[in-house]
């Protein structure tokens, strides 16, 4: 799953679908559902976080307004959120998908996200533990210095 999440869309594909998207927008003032999806699909696979976020926004709009493709939209919402390390949102979309139907690829993505959440929690605990040690050391040093000062004054 990690390999799939790290796979990046070729720049020429992204540019082609971006051009198609903007062409339809300029021509008709509206973009077809298929073109929106193709563009969003490329964006969530971009190497740039802002592109991924833009793809997520398009997919969210599609999921709200076009229930026919909701299954695909929800999967790529989970996928895009996992790519930008928005694991809580990614997990929410995985669960929403699995409520619709069982799918091994989505289960695999869900497991990957859960492992990444566990890693983040562990990192947070290490940082908190390190901060507590530093604070304890500073407090201990302060107490030792105060005692030393009291001894000198006597």
From Swiss-Prot:
It is a single-pass membrane protein. The C-terminus is required for mitochondrial localization, while the N-terminus is necessary for mitochondrial fission. This is Mitochondrial fission 1 protein. Residues 146-154 are mitochondrial intermembrane. Keywords: Membrane, Mitochondrion, Mitochondrion outer membrane, Transmembrane, Transmembrane helix. GO terms for biological process: mitochondrial fission; mitochondrion organization; peroxisome fission; positive regulation of mitochondrial fission. GO terms for cellular component: mitochondrial outer membrane; peroxisomal membrane. The chain crosses the membrane at residues 125-145. Belongs to the FIS1 family. PANTHER family: MITOCHONDRIAL FISSION 1 PROTEIN (PTHR13247:SF0), TETRATRICOPEPTIDE REPEAT PROTEIN 11 TPR REPEAT PROTEIN 11 (PTHR13247). GO terms for molecular function: lipid binding; molecular adaptor activity. Involved in the fragmentation of the mitochondrial network and its perinuclear clustering. Functions downstream of Pink1 and upstream of Drp1 to regulate mitochondrial fission. Disruption phenotype: RNAi-mediated knockdown results in elongated mitochondria.
